[in-house]
From Swiss-Prot:
Coiled coil: none annotated. This is Protein FAM133A. InterPro entries: Fam133. Disulfide bonds: none annotated. Belongs to the FAM133 family. Residues 68-80, 147-156, 163-175, 211-220 have a biased composition (Basic and acidic residues).
Length: 248
């Protein structure tokens, strides 16, 4: 049994296209565009004339509109100018009225000035006396305030010194308590309020003595234990040596 032939015939696409021939195009071709119907020269002239007449009508309409607009502009200008003239006239009238009122007030003030001058002198004298009294009062009050401020400053300085001394004492006690904690962590800290420095030192010395005594007692106990162990060890050696002699 031989193998099946699975080969397929190769078809050249270019050769197949040539064999099929030209394709039928859908829609107008280039030749149709070139052979389109075209207007004659006379028809073109008519179209140009129609365009010119249309532009003339538009130009006439624009000219009319411009004329109307110019007329409206002139009217509005006249109105504005007339309004400005009327406002300027009103201003001039107001100025004249003000001048007249100033003249009348100046004449009346000249008559009143003579009477008011005497009154003003009396008032100035009274005000001068009042100012002197106020100055004297302010000077006295300033002196009293300076004395009070000096006394207050002295008291504040004394209080600051006392507070500094107290803070320094507290710092010293705290530093001693910290040192005590570092050297003897098992001891309870003494409060700064209940114990002074001397009491604290006495307590520290007493505790040192107690600890020294405890250490000495512990050393003695260790020595006694070592002696007992040494005696036991020597007895065991003697027993071993005696048993060895008997065996010989």
């Amino acid at each position: 049994m031989g193998k099946r032939d699975n080969r397929v015939a190769y078809m050249n696409p270019i050769a197949m296209a040539r064999w099929r021939g030209p394709t039928q195009s859908v829609g107008p071709t280039i030749q149709d565009y070139l052979n389109r119907p075209r207007p004659t020269w006379e028809e073109v002239k008519k179209q140009l004339e129609n365009k010119k007449t249309g532009s003339k009508a538009l130009a006439e309409f624009e000219e009319k509109m411009n004329e109307n607009w110019k007329k409206e502009l002139e009217k509005s200008r006249e109105k504005l100018l007339s309004g400005n003239e009327s406002s300027s006239k009103k201003r001039e009238r107001k100025k004249k009225r003000k001048k007249k009122s100033c003249r009348s007030s100046s004449s009346s003030s000249s008559s009143d000035s003579s009477s008011s001058s005497s009154d003003s002198e009396d008032e100035e004298k009274k005000q001068g006396k009042r100012r002197k009294k106020k100055k004297n009062r302010s000077y006295k009050s300033s002196q009293s305030s300076t004395h009070e401020s000096e006394s207050e400053s002295k008291e504040s300085v004394k209080k600051k010194k006392k507070s500094k001394d107290e803070t320094e004492k507290e710092k010293d006690v705290r530093s001693l308590s910290k040192k005590r904690k570092k050297s003897y962590p098992d001891d309870k800290p003494l409060s700064s309020e209940s114990s002074s420095e001397s009491d604290y030192e006495e307590d520290v010395q007493a505790k040192k003595k107690r600890r020294c005594e405890e250490r000495e007692q512990a050393k003695e106990k260790v020595k006694k234990k070592k002696k007992k162990q040494h005696k036991k060890h020597s007895k065991k050696k003697k027993k071993k040596s005696g048993s060895s002699h008997k065996s010989r």
